[in-house]
From Swiss-Prot:
One of its GO terms (cellular component) is mitochondrial inner membrane. Residues 1-25 form a transit peptide. Residues 1-61 are annotated as: N-terminal domain. Involved in regulation of mitochondrial membrane ATP synthase. Necessary for H(+) conduction of ATP synthase. Facilitates energy-driven catalysis of ATP synthesis by blocking a proton leak through an alternative proton exit pathway. Keywords: ATP synthesis, CF(0), Hydrogen ion transport, Ion transport, Leucine-rich repeat, Magnesium, Membrane, Metal-binding, Mitochondrion, Mitochondrion inner membrane, Repeat, Transit peptide, Transport. It comes from Mus musculus (Mouse). Its main location: mitochondrion. Belongs to the ATP synthase subunit s family. This is ATP synthase subunit s, mitochondrial.
Length: 200
């Protein structure tokens, strides 16, 4: 007890960090915890269930193959026959997904659509990592990236590796500067791609 009191007094004597700064670090730490990959869980329940848990924990929504309804509540995840629920679409609007969690997506084979909107932790390295996932390269048909302020031309260019991509919508990305060059890159790499740019 004496030791705790001594440490407590020392901590109290330190210059206080402003609450907003302190709060920001707390939330960043918590979001990092939410994104941490549990490889044992991944092995035990399979990629679609583990990825569903991760995405919902981070505030995203998922839709399974053969279902119209979006799942957004962690407590409503299907409990039985987890093997038959395959993720077809991901809506990560306002979610805290980040690059350290992307290993959850390695085994996903049926994802056709991803929406990344107002994802503050999505950066170029996240898009580059996503574009390296072989299963996603094959399955992804539609991708929307909206209001992700840390994305630049370098991250967007990596998306050309999604060889079956049919639709790409990019909007409100202040870090993306050369839209003419991007349009040319995608026209060359993915001639059948419908590219919509709403960039300044």
């Amino acid at each position: 007890m004496m030791m705790f009191g001594k440490i407590s007094r020392q901590l109290c004597s330190l210059k206080k960090i402003p609450w907003s700064c302190d709060s920001r670090y707390f939330w960043e730490w918590l979001n990092t915890v939410f994104n941490k990959v549990d490889y044992e869980r991944l092995r035990d329940v399979g990629p679609d269930r583990a990825a569903s848990e991760w995405l919902l924990r981070c505030g995203a929504k998922v839709r399974y193959c053969g279902h119209q309804k979006w799942l957004h509540d962690y407590n409503t995840l299907p409990g039985s026959s987890i093997d038959r629920y395959k993720i077809q679409a991901i809506d990560a609007t306002d979610s805290c997904i980040m690059d350290i969690g992307l290993d959850h997506m390695v085994g996903l084979e049926h994802v056709e659509k991803i929406t990344l909107c107002k994802c503050h932790y999505i950066e170029d390295n996240c898009l580059q990592r996503l574009s390296q996932l072989e299963n996603l390269r094959k399955s992804l048909l539609e991708l929307e990236i909206i209001a992700c302020g840390n994305v630049t031309d370098n991250g967007v260019i990596a998306l050309r590796h999604f060889r079956n991509l049919k639709y790409l919508f990019l909007s409100d990305l202040p870090g993306v500067k050369d839209k003419e060059y991007l349009a040319q890159v995608f026209k060359t790499a993915l001639p059948s791609l419908e590219l919509k740019l709403n960039l300044k």
